[in-house]
Amino acid sequence: MPGKGDAPVLPGARAVARYVRISPMKARRVVNLVRGLPAKEALTVLQFAPQAASEQVYKVLASAIANAENNERLDPDALLVSEAYVDEGPTMKRFQPRAQGRAYRIRKRTCHITVVVEAVAPAAPKKAAAKKAAPAKETTPAATESKTEGAE
């Protein structure tokens, strides 16, 4: 039951990719590009983003759109990326042998990518009821002449 002051719940869908073998910081860079964009525009941005993580985020976003279309019967053109975040997953630890019997630790980081899309009602056309600005006082040559005549 929604509490007092809660925002209205919009229809939408979500998709989660867990244990993705990408560093969470690198995935967050890509997710920040698409948060708040319309879903179709976000797909285009991800398609041409040079980062390696954009491929995984693209798949998650496409899955969220498909979930909204097939499970919730929503129009894919009216979807907006309302939430997109990356959580840290487990880190696999490996050792890299080094000289003199040493070993350096290698951290293979994973992340969980979550994308939520919501249907947005088409925006009502705004009325062009812009108030007319008061006309600026114009100084005409006749007005300036009358002022200067009295000063002589």
From Swiss-Prot:
Gene3D superfamilies: Ribosomal protein L22/L17. Residues 124-145 have a biased composition (Low complexity). Keywords: Ribonucleoprotein, Ribosomal protein, RNA-binding, rRNA-binding. Part of the 50S ribosomal subunit. This protein binds specifically to 23S rRNA; its binding is stimulated by other ribosomal proteins, e.g. L4, L17, and L20. It is important during the early stages of 50S assembly. It makes multiple contacts with different domains of the 23S rRNA in the assembled 50S subunit and ribosome. The globular domain of the protein is located near the polypeptide exit tunnel on the outside of the subunit, while an extended beta-hairpin is found that lines the wall of the exit tunnel in the center of the 70S ribosome. Belongs to the universal ribosomal protein uL22 family. It comes from the Bacteria. InterPro entries: Ribosomal_uL22, Ribosomal_uL22_bac/chlpt-type, Ribosomal_uL22_bac/org-type, Ribosomal_uL22_CS, Ribosomal_uL22_sf. This is Large ribosomal subunit protein uL22. GO terms for cellular component: cytosolic large ribosomal subunit. It comes from Salinispora tropica (strain ATCC BAA-916 / DSM 44818 / JCM 13857 / NBRC 105044 / CNB-440). Residues 124-152 are annotated as: Disordered. GO terms for molecular function: rRNA binding; structural constituent of ribosome. GO terms for biological process: translation. SUPFAM superfamilies: Ribosomal protein L22. PROSITE patterns: RIBOSOMAL_L22.
